[in-house]
Amino acid sequence: MKTVQLDQLKQQFPLIQTLQDYQETFWFNPHRYPLNEALAKVGLTEQDVKEAEARLARFAPYLAKVFPETQAQYGKIESALVKIADMQQALSLQKHKTLTGKLWLKKDSHLPISGSIKARGGIYEVLAHAEKLAIEAGLLKLEDDYSKLDQDSFRTFFSKYQIAVGSTGNLGLSIGIMSAKLGFRVSVHMSADARQWKKDKLRSLGVNVVEYASDYGVAVEEGRKAAEQDPFCFFIDDENSTTLFLGYAVAGLRLKQQFEQKQIKVDADHPLFVYLPCGVGGGPGGVSFGLKLAFGEHVHCIFAEPTHSPCMLLGVYTGLHDQISVNDIGLDNITAADGLAVGRASGFVGRAMQQLIDGYYTIHDECLYELIALLNQTENIQVEPSAAAGMMGPYYVQTTPDYLALHQLSAEKLQHATHVLWATGGGMVPPDEMQKYLTHSQSN
């Protein structure tokens, strides 16, 4: 972006200067529409989400058979929702501000199969593609027991096809693991931010890992180009895929079921706040769509991004979406939160969800390290830095009077609020890597 254009943009959007200075900030969205109007702009419906849930149910017998870790939930890929009262108390002490309401952790960090939120969207899209191919070939019917897919004849059939994806790590991991299990040939195009252990894990499964010295955007673009050369190759597009998005959206319906089981009330007097780490936007965007369908006006969805990679905040704030990158305003897009190291947000998610997402904030890397150490110390739960991005959300909400006034959130309502921190990854991090994360804040 030319300097002149940037100067004009900064006059119109003064918050850009704060982003350029790598400062932490909270911006709440003044452009939210009434719920039904905003949902209509997404281009997808509740019926689409229910069909995604039904597809996952069809695959459950197969998943339970080939991934023993899913057997306890009969092949359902779902994570626990746990109360973290000690963490809440520790955060209150750290910020010298009593955080009211109840704090919960949604442990997508420990989802079965691939240990991150990407197990929702990534695995779902691979399954949807496999189902389509097998049905078109006359090998599978919707009413079949899908555990039959665990046969050499199906693996041989799928081996004629290739799946490709560009990733900073976790999406590649989920798609690589699932595709290889079904028998597909897989190529994962990985950016410079991707952790070595994730590449090693994929290679051990026979996945072709293509490494780039550049960032996420280049890995996606090169993956897309390579896939276009092969008519038998299906490219999973993290930036634009509605299938991925629907896989994530199922989480909203599932969380509502968990709330019912735990008798957690959500209504006008008992608001729900959900804090979601955001990279390119597909995961948090899809989950938020599902949450808005499930809880309506009573759920507040807040996105969290590293100060070095605030691509969704920048795109939605300026209205430029994927037409602007963090590099255009001079940011380096280098962060310890490798899963969030994305310079240009998904245009599809930004435009679809801009009237639904309630707020956005940025967080320093050092703060991420402190938060994962605090969670480990108070709750004995280990997550990766990306997963901690949402943990400052309750503090921002409760210390921003304009936001509270806009949504008519009284002290009494906040007293009865539920706060859910969506932990997005970390369950598969090797112990020695996790130890480095946890000791980082002590050594600085």
Curated annotation (Swiss-Prot):
Q: Name one GO molecular function term.
A: pyridoxal phosphate binding
**Keywords per UniProt:** Lyase, Pyridoxal phosphate
Q: Which cofactor does it need?
A: pyridoxal 5'-phosphate
Q: Which residues carry this modification: N6-(pyridoxal phosphate)lysine?
A: 118
Q: Could you tell me the Gene Ontology terms of the biological process aspect for this record?
A: D-serine catabolic process; isoleucine biosynthetic process
- Entry-linked InterPro entries: D_Ser_am_lyase (IPR011780), Ser/Thr_Dehydratase (IPR050147), Ser/Thr_deHydtase_PyrdxlP-BS (IPR000634), TrpB-like_PALP (IPR001926), TrpB-like_PALP_sf (IPR036052)
PROSITE patterns of this UniProt entry?
DEHYDRATASE_SER_THR
- Tell me the CDD domains matching this sequence: D-Ser-dehyd (cd06447)
Keyword check for Membrane = no
What EC number(s) does the entry state? 4.3.1.18
Top-level lineage group: Bacteria
**Record's catalysed reaction(s):** D-serine = pyruvate + NH4(+)
Concerning SUPFAM superfamilies, the annotation shows: Tryptophan synthase beta subunit-like PLP-dependent enzymes (SSF53686)
- Entry's family note: Belongs to the serine/threonine dehydratase family. DsdA subfamily.
Q: What is this protein called?
A: Probable D-serine dehydratase
Q: Which organism is it from?
A: Acinetobacter baumannii (strain AB0057)
